[in-house]
């Protein structure tokens, strides 16, 4: 029987719990550094798989600059969006369902050289005005959205004609049990809601590096339990075992592709 998607309140509680534990974030950050080396932007406090090279590529693909405004959809702690704002000179509005994440993003934003603001909202209901943004971005969020078409439709709604939506995410043929169902094709849904595709790039080394991340995490499970406590540690360890096929024998990383996508809202081209 098909399960109903989680309610807004359930989703908020899940992500608040995810973001509130700074010890988990710090432990994962060290694992990212070990897996990615200098490519990992540790200074941004990000809790995802974004790299410096991908951030530069996203900034270029947005085609925005000073005097323009971009939305960071599912901004989390805000680090990648703030990097993009600084690199492009554009103002940024971050949207996230977690008030805990937004508070951490606001604290991180207390620095000169960027214009940023944050407000509570979901990917498919941002509360932003229509056709007012010169670009939108998202880092490793879309996989968790139950209704991806609604999320893409909301993104196209807030963008001006010709504006770009640039994001990283995963396309998957299989997902472990108790994870969101696999999503294989962003492009068809993007086109259906009014985007034209400018870039669809499979990040070829991404899942190999994610495997290294999980291997290092499992190798340090005693340290993880000591630092995070049994319950929090076992959640992270189960994630690694599940994706590597150590629970049911299916290596799900072999059925997963991390992608970088740039799509333009149909209309006049931006400079």
Q: Model-derived features: where do they sit?
A:
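N-terminal, positively charged/glycine-rich alpha-helical extensions of SAM-dependent methyltransferases
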Residues: 1-38
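Conserved alpha-helix/loop element of class I SAM-dependent methyltransferases that forms part
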Residues: 31, 48-66
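Class I SAM-dependent methyltransferase SAM/SAH-binding core
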Residues: 69-73, 77-125
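A short acidic, Gly/Pro-enriched loop at the edge of an enzyme's catalytic core
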Residues: 124-136
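A short SAM/SAH-binding and catalytic strip from SAM-dependent methyltransferases
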Residues: 135-147
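A short glycine-rich, Lys/Arg-flanked "PGG" loop and its adjoining helix->strand segment in the class I
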Residues: 149-164
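Conserved class I S-adenosyl-L-methionine
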Residues: 164-187
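Conserved Class I S-adenosyl-L-methionine
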Residues: 203-271
């Amino acid at each position: 029987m098909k399960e109903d998607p989680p309610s807004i309140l359930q989703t908020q509680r899940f992500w608040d719990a995810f973001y509130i534990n700074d010890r988990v974030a710090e432990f994962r950050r060290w694992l990212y550094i070990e897996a990615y080396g200098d490519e990992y932007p540790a200074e941004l406090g990000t809790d995802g798989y974004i790299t410096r090279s991908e951030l530069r590529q996203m900034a270029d693909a947005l085609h925005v600059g000073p005097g323009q405004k971009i939305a960071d959809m599912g901004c989390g702690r805000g680090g990648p969006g703030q990097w993009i704002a600084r690199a492009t000179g554009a103002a940024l509005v971050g949207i996230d369902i977690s008030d805990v994440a937004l508070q951490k993003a606001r604290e991180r934003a207390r620095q000169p050289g960027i214009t940023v603001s944050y407000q509570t909202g979901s990917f498919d209901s941002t509360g932003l005005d229509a056709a007012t943004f010169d670009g939108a971005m998202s880092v490793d969020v879309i996989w968790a959205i139950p209704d991806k078409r609604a999320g893409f439709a909301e993104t196209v709604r807030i963008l001006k004609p010709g504006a770009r939506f640039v994001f990283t995410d995963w396309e998957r043929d299989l997902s472990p049990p108790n994870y969101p169902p696999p999503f294989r094709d962003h492009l068809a849904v993007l086109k259906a809601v009014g985007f034209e595709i400018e870039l669809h790039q499979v990040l070829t080394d991404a899942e190999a590096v994610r495997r290294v991340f999980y291997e290092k995490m499992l190798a340090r499970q005693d340290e993880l339990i000591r630092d995070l406590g049994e319950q929090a540690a076992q959640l992270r360890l189960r994630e690694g075992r599940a994706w590597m096929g150590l629970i049911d024998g299916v290596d799900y990383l072999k059925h997963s592709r991390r992608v970088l996508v740039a799509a333009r809202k149909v209309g006049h081209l931006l400079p």
